[in-house]
From Swiss-Prot:
Annotated keywords: Ribonucleoprotein, Ribosomal protein, RNA-binding, rRNA-binding
Cellular-component GO terms for this entry: large ribosomal subunit
Basic and acidic residues biased stretches: 264-277
This protein's record includes keyword Methyltransferase: no
InterPro entries on file: NA-bd_OB-fold, Rib_uL2_dom2, Ribosomal_uL2, Ribosomal_uL2_bac/org-type, Ribosomal_uL2_C, Ribosomal_uL2_CS, Ribosomal_uL2_dom3, Ribosomal_uL2_RNA-bd_dom
Name of the protein in question: Large ribosomal subunit protein uL2
One of the GO BP terms on file: cytoplasmic translation
Gene3D superfamilies xref list: 2.30.30.30, Nucleic acid-binding proteins, Ribosomal protein L2, domain 3
Keyword Ribosomal protein attached: yes
UniProt organism field: Streptococcus thermophilus (strain ATCC BAA-250 / LMG 18311)
Gene Ontology MF, one: rRNA binding
SUPFAM superfamilies: Nucleic acid-binding proteins, Translation proteins SH3-like domain
Family statement: Belongs to the universal ribosomal protein uL2 family.
Length: 277
């Protein structure tokens, strides 16, 4: 998918880029796989803001994505490549030979008319899903499960990929996009290939309004707030923080504080941290 560059006809258009959607084959989604989405604007069931900077934006339907890929031995044909407003990756509509329709994350190189299949005996081909134990060392994968049968949780964003490094007993060593090397059960499934739409990260929005269309509201700095709104607020002019370390709006340490649970059981499955060289 290429990038479209706009002429600087206005200040908002200067340096603006967008995808040309050349890979998209239809603009009409499969109706049976759509679910309505209510705009919650970052509020919980009490109406209180639990996630800041959310609200507005274009209305969306949620596309039901098959992250489990558990229809073993049943072949599917790729019918369309579609845009999904709920994620950075594109999605593909597949029709199984038993009549079932499903959406999957569209990997790079997947084309309309291509046949894909899931199961331990599937070929090592883009779009096929297999247990990690059946995938050869060095294979590039995405859509990785962490618990067998739960559905893919890792490597689902546009352009993301991971690589199989080896096998240790019932676990498979996988190097993730971040550089972290992690042990994952060999019975967990993954899909062959890299997630498509890899140029999505190169897009320059050009103006704040495009973020608003996506439902993202402005982020206000704490230093320009009043002292009753933020620990950094108040003072005359550009005042310093006035604390030993920067704080969140709720007074907790910000910037650099480790937030991972020190007793996390998954620590023993992480062979190398993402920030280790």
């Amino acid at each position: 998918m290429g990038i479209k560059v706009y002429k600087p006809t206005t200040n908002g258009r200067r340096n603006m880029t967008s995808l040309d959607f050349a890979e998209i084959t239809t603009s009409t989604p499969e109706k049976s796989l759509l679910v309505s989405l209510k705009n919650k604007a970052g509020r919980n069931n009490n109406g209180r803001i639990t996630v800041r900077h959310q609200g507005g934006g274009h209305k969306r339907h949620y596309r039901l994505i098959d992250f489990k890929r558990n229809k073993d031995g049943v072949e599917a044909v790729v019918k369309t490549i579609e845009y999904d407003p709920n994620r950075t990756a594109n999605i593909a509509l597949v029709h199984y030979t038993d009549g079932v329709k499903a959406y999957i994350i569209a990997p790079k190189g997947l084309e309309v008319g291509q046949r894909i299949v899931s199961g331990p005996d599937a070929d090592i081909k883009v779009g096929n899903a297999l247990p990690l134990a059946n995938i050869p060392v060095g294979t590039v994968i995405h859509n990785i499960e962490l618990k067998p049968g739960k559905g893919a949780e890792l490597v689902r964003a546009a352009g993301a990929s991971a690589q199989v490094l080896g096998q240790e007993g019932k676990y498979v060593l996988v190097r993730l996009q971040s550089g972290e090397v992690r042990m994952i059960l060999g019975t967990c499934r993954a899909t062959i290939g890299t997630v498509g739409n890899e140029q999505q990260s190169l897009i320059n929005l050009g103006k704040a309004g495009r973020n608003r269309w996506k439902g993202v509201r402005p982020t206000v700095r704490g230093s320009v707030m009043n002292p009753n709104d933020h620990p950094h607020g108040g003072g005359e002019g550009k005042a310093p923080v006035g604390r030993k370390a920067p704080s969140t709006p709720w007074g907790k340490p910000a910037l650099g504080l480790k937030t991972r649970n020190k007793k996390a059981k998954s620590d023993k499955l992480i062979v190398r941290r993402r920030n280790e060289k």
